């Protein structure tokens, strides 16, 4: 019969051995992609994936891999999650009859404080006040901002952001909010054409063929224009269908789908801002759109001297984004652990 002390030490050994394995199951609720050699070495990009329609949960990890692997940026992807900590694009954005409305949640927003750039891809979120405050601290810091697709209407509950006592709308920061679909939602697609007058802008370096199967957003009234201080970079022409070679809709004028501006913070710091209303998971299968956004990453951090027309924007590994939309069962969209998107 083993000595009691032998049994005691055996139990301790088993506990110590099991400890790390058990702890390994509790990985952080975000994804990290280490940077390395490249122009972005030593710079940190945080990407926020928290929409319900355009598969940001697939698009942002793909973009993070491109930026870290080909360009050297350290990338962190934060997700909107449910009560179980799962990435959940199915969470409602408005109260539903007879159901408790639950606030959205993005773990890890504290990391915005150490970011050199944040790429926003939320949609109509109602976040707890402490999380909204973390976002405001970043956007008022003077650091650069990139917003993709639904990012221009990313927050339903207003951010607690005031300058000189006046409430600041998120749309003011990024240069215009969503005002409707310019054409037919889920029926049109978009051909992007660089604005001729901006052909030499660094963000357009090497950018030519842009197409995505999402439709064009309207961000200003008919007959109007982008807000003062915004400079259009890409025109979006609605097409009569969702195929790359479909003809343009002759009844719909092209509208800006990408622009840049500078945001003046409460302390008069100037932040570089880039908005693309293209950027769905399937849109980003287009190399031209990926190059536009990667170039914008460099420009936003005042690294435009490192932009070249040949830097790789190739997808790393496999990328098979699901289609956009809210028919979650048909599309196969269910809550998943963060690790499923690695």
Segments and roles (model prediction):
Residues 37-42, 110-114, 138-141, 224-227, ...:
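Extracellular/periplasmic catalytic domains that process cell-envelope and extracellular macromolecules
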Residues 41-42, 148-245, 309-342:
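An acidic, glycine-rich "communication" segment
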Residues 13-24:
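Hydrophobic h-region of N-terminal signal peptides that target proteins for export
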Residues 31-33, 46-48, 52-154:
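Helical hinge/lid and interdomain linker segments adjacent to catalytic or ligand-binding clefts
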Residues 50-53, 186-192, 204, 208, ...:
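Active-site rim elements
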Residues 3-14:
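Sec-dependent signal peptide recognition
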Residues 24-40, 58-59, 69-70, 81, ...:
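Extracellular ligand-binding/catalytic regions of CAZymes and related secreted enzymes
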């Amino acid at each position: 019969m083993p000595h009691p002390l032998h049994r005691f030490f055996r139990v301790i050994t088993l506990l110590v051995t099991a400890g790390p394995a058990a702890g390994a199951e509790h990985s952080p609720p975000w994804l990290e992609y280490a940077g390395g050699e490249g122009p972005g070495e030593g710079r940190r990009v945080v990407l926020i994936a928290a929409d319900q329609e355009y598969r940001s949960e697939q698009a942002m990890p793909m973009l993070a891999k491109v930026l870290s692997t080909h360009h050297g940026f350290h990338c962190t992807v934060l997700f909107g999650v449910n009560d179980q900590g799962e990435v959940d694009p199915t969470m409602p954005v408005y109260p539903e009859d007879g159901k408790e409305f639950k606030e959205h949640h993005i773990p890890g927003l504290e990391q915005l404080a150490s970011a050199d750039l944040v790429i926003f891809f939320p949609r109509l979120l109602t976040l707890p006040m402490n999380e909204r405050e973390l976002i405001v601290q970043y956007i008022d810091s003077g650091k650069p901002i990139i917003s993709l697709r639904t990012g221009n209407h990313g927050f339903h509950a207003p951010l607690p952001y005031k300058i000189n006592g006046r409430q600041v709308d998120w749309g003011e920061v990024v240069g215009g909010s969503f005002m409707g679909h310019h054409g037919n939602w889920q029926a049109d697609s978009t051909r992007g054409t660089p604005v001729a007058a901006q052909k030499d802008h660094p963000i357009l370096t090497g950018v030519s063929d842009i197409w995505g199967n999402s439709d064009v957003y309207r961000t200003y009234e008919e007959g109007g224009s982008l807000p003062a201080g915004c400079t259009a970079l890409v025109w979006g022409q609605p097409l009569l269908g969702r195929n790359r070679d479909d003809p343009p809709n002759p009844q719909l004028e092209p509208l800006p789908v990408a622009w840049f501006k500078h945001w003046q913070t409460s302390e008069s710091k100037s932040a570089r801002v880039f908005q693309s209303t293209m950027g769905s998971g399937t849109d980003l299968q287009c190399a031209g759109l990926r190059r536009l956004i990667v170039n914008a990453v460099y420009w936003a951090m005042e690294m435009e001297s490192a932009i070249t027309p040949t830097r790789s924007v190739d997808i790393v590994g496999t990328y098979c984004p699901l289609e956009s939309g809210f028919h979650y069962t048909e599309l196969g969209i269910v809550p998943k652990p963060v690790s499923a998107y690695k």
